[in-house]
């Protein structure tokens, strides 16, 4: 054995440890009691309804006292009844692009708002948004159907005239 390396001292046995006196034991007991006293829920918390903070506000909370709505057979041999199926809500049939375009072009509200704009009156944000969305939809439908505005045709004719002048010179 190397004389430089010494063994670690052995652990002190339980019998040789210093015994605690009555004051120390009482202080530890009071501390344990104080900690134990503050465990659990506050008084009166057993039947409180849960607050809506934890759950999303868009969804209405179900009452936990209400049970299932499934009918229960009262006679042992009776077959269970079939659940009632809710009728499906029919969606409105989609209009063809031609019908939708005709409907938008004959829109009285749009005509009245466009007349107000031509007269120089100002529109509210809602009215302006309605005009913009309706005109955008009309443009999309005209593109889909391959209909071009007269203004575009005139611009194309002007470009053709310019090209002919350039080629002729």
From Swiss-Prot:
Pfam families documented for this protein: YihI (PF04220)
Annotated region (Disordered), positions in chain: 1-83, 150-169
GO molecular function: GTPase activator activity
Compositional bias segments (type: Basic residues): 31-40
Keyword Membrane: no
Ranges of Basic and acidic residues composition bias in the record: 21-30, 51-66, 150-161
Single GO BP term: ribosome biogenesis
Record bears the keyword Repressor: no
Keyword field: GTPase activation, Ribosome biogenesis
UniProt subunit comment: Interacts with Der.
Biological role: A GTPase-activating protein (GAP) that modifies Der/EngA GTPase function. May play a role in ribosome biogenesis.
Family: Belongs to the YihI family.
This protein's name: Der GTPase-activating protein YihI
Native source species: Photorhabdus laumondii subsp. laumondii (strain DSM 15139 / CIP 105565 / TT01)
